[in-house]
């Protein structure tokens, strides 16, 4: 770095420098202390600390030292990510240090601990200033069963792939988050427990549940109404009850983004309610979807939603790859019927995104292009770069959209191999 550049940076206000450093990992932020006397202590006032712990000894010592050196009255966010090699590391002491040393202003705590056993101190669940709490890992535990939970400021709670103590403690934790707006609970596929009633939380705006038994207790006598809920994602539910889910959907007046498994999505086809704000629908399928199956899903749901959801524009079909990891197969955007000469289902589709993962995907692409006569934007993504496409025979008919309406083509993961070249040359020379 030249003296001129250093001089220009030094002239910036401290608040602006601290803001810039907040977007950089803590490892690199601490290095700035070598620039000058001014920078020697400047890093200790950065409000956000981000640690990516991949080394057993050296990085642990660095984290310990930097966490204690940081000025306690300004730390607002702590993010610790553990690599898979640290499967036996207990990061509880680091969390306790953050809570005790920086308790006054800690607003965000995120633990991304893959396949580790982590002991969480009970003080974590009585932090008055905590707004965001995200826990991700296989085994997360507390030193003792929860008896007291007081998180009055908590707005966002994510529990992702975590075996989090016992169900009673989990219920206590969730039931004492009275002002939460963003809730995500994802359990591993082999862990199911009693249904969890979400109807108590009237402030929810985003809800994602996976691996539970149900979303609303059948025995619940409370009125089911989530007046602010905009995003709902429900998947891998054991003994899912359509009646309880209907109660929920019928009382989410501003719902705009909905994700369901195919086996439970039939409730939409049989539910006669108005969903005036619904714009996005994602269906998760566990089968190797072919063109016929894709067309059937699109036709059924777009026709139904055209009646009950006048704002509906985005439809996607996803495939369950493994655990709770999904990859999309097809995403489409529908045009406004009043602006199209033909308002039929497939002619409304103006934007198509397709995941290319096999010859099956290429055949599906051809079938979709033949049906989507008004397509304007086409985006392709090659998911498996190590699986080249074989040679394929181009269709005898040229899709109408390639000759008239298609304006934009984007292809991510293009490999330049034979199958890709065949597909590219055939598509482009016709467009």
Swiss-Prot record:
<dbReference type="InterPro" id="IPR055411">
    <property type="entry name" value="LRR_FXL15/At3g58940/PEG3-like"/>
</dbReference>
<dbReference type="Pfam" id="PF00646">
    <property type="entry name" value="F-box"/>
</dbReference>
<dbReference type="InterPro" id="IPR053781">
    <property type="entry name" value="F-box_AtFBL13-like"/>
</dbReference>
<keyword id="KW-0433">Leucine-rich repeat</keyword>
<feature type="repeat" description="LRR 8">
    <location>
        <begin position="357"/>
        <end position="382"/>
    </location>
</feature>
<feature type="domain" description="FBD">
    <location>
        <begin position="391"/>
        <end position="423"/>
    </location>
</feature>
<keyword id="KW-0677">Repeat</keyword>
<feature type="repeat" description="LRR 7">
    <location>
        <begin position="264"/>
        <end position="285"/>
    </location>
</feature>
<feature type="domain" description="F-box">
    <location>
        <begin position="6"/>
        <end position="62"/>
    </location>
</feature>
<protein>
    <recommendedName>
        <fullName>Putative F-box/FBD/LRR-repeat protein At3g56780</fullName>
    </recommendedName>
</protein>
<dbReference type="InterPro" id="IPR013101">
    <property type="entry name" value="LRR_PRU1-like"/>
</dbReference>
<dbReference type="Pfam" id="PF24758">
    <property type="entry name" value="LRR_At5g56370"/>
</dbReference>
<dbReference type="InterPro" id="IPR050232">
    <property type="entry name" value="FBL13/AtMIF1-like"/>
</dbReference>
<dbReference type="InterPro" id="IPR006566">
    <property type="entry name" value="FBD"/>
</dbReference>
<feature type="repeat" description="LRR 3">
    <location>
        <begin position="135"/>
        <end position="161"/>
    </location>
</feature>
<feature type="repeat" description="LRR 2">
    <location>
        <begin position="88"/>
        <end position="113"/>
    </location>
</feature>
<feature type="repeat" description="LRR 5">
    <location>
        <begin position="209"/>
        <end position="236"/>
    </location>
</feature>
<dbReference type="Pfam" id="PF07723">
    <property type="entry name" value="LRR_2"/>
</dbReference>
<dbReference type="InterPro" id="IPR001810">
    <property type="entry name" value="F-box_dom"/>
</dbReference>
<dbReference type="InterPro" id="IPR032675">
    <property type="entry name" value="LRR_dom_sf"/>
</dbReference>
<feature type="repeat" description="LRR 4">
    <location>
        <begin position="162"/>
        <end position="187"/>
    </location>
</feature>
<feature type="repeat" description="LRR 1">
    <location>
        <begin position="56"/>
        <end position="82"/>
    </location>
</feature>
<dbReference type="InterPro" id="IPR036047">
    <property type="entry name" value="F-box-like_dom_sf"/>
</dbReference>
<feature type="repeat" description="LRR 6">
    <location>
        <begin position="237"/>
        <end position="262"/>
    </location>
</feature>
<dbReference type="Pfam" id="PF08387">
    <property type="entry name" value="FBD"/>
</dbReference>
């Amino acid at each position: 770095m030249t003296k001129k550049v250093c001089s220009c940076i030094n002239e910036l206000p401290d608040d602006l420098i601290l803001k810039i450093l907040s977007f950089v990992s803590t490892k690199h932020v601490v290095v700035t202390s070598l620039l000058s006397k001014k920078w020697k202590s400047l890093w200790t006032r950065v409000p956000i600390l981000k640690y990516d712990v991949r080394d057993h000894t050296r990085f642990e010592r660095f984290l310990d030292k930097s966490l204690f050196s940081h000025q306690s009255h300004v730390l607002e966010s702590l993010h610790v990510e553990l690599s898979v090699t640290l499967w036996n590391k207990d990061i509880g002491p680091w969390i306790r240090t953050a809570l005790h040393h920086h308790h006054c202003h800690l607003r965000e705590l995120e633990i991304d601990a893959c396949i580790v056993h982590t002991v969480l101190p009970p003080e974590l669940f009585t932090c008055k200033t905590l707004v965001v709490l995200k826990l991700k890992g296989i085994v997360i535990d507390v030193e003792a069963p929860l008896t007291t939970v007081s998180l009055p400021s908590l707005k966002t709670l994510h529990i992702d792939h975590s075996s989090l103590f016992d169900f009673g403690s989990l219920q206590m934790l969730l039931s004492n988050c009275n002002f939460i707006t963003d809730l995500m609970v994802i359990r591993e596929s082999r862990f199911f427990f009693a249904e969890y009633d979400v109807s108590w939380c009237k402030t929810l705006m985003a809800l994602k549940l996976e691996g539970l038994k149900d979303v609303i207790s059948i025995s619940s006598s409370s009125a089911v109404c989530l007046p602010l809920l905009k995003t709902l994602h429900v998947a891998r539910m054991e003994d899912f009850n359509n009646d309880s889910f209907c109660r929920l959907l019928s009382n989410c007046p501003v719902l705009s983004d909905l994700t369901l498994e195919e086996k439970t999505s039939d409730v939409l086809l049989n539910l006669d309610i108005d969903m005036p704000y619904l714009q996005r629908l994602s269906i998760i399928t566990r089968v190797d979807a072919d063109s016929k199956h894709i067309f059937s899903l699109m036709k059924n749901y777009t026709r139904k939603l055209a009646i009950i959801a006048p704002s509906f524009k985005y439809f996607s079909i996803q495939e369950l790859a493994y655990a709770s990891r999904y990859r999309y197969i097809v995403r489409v955007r529908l045009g406004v019927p009043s602006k199209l000469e033909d308002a039929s289902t497939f002619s409304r589709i103006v934007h198509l995104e397709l995941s290319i993962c096999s010859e099956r995907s290429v055949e599906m692409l051809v079938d979709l292009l033949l049906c989507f006569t008004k397509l304007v934007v086409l985006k392709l993504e090659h998911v498996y770069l190590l699986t080249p496409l074989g040679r394929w025979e181009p269709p005898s008919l040229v899709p109408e959209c390639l000759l008239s309406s298609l304006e934009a083509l984007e292809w991510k993961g293009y490999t330049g191999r034979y199958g890709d070249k065949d597909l590219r040359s055939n598509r482009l020379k016709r467009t």
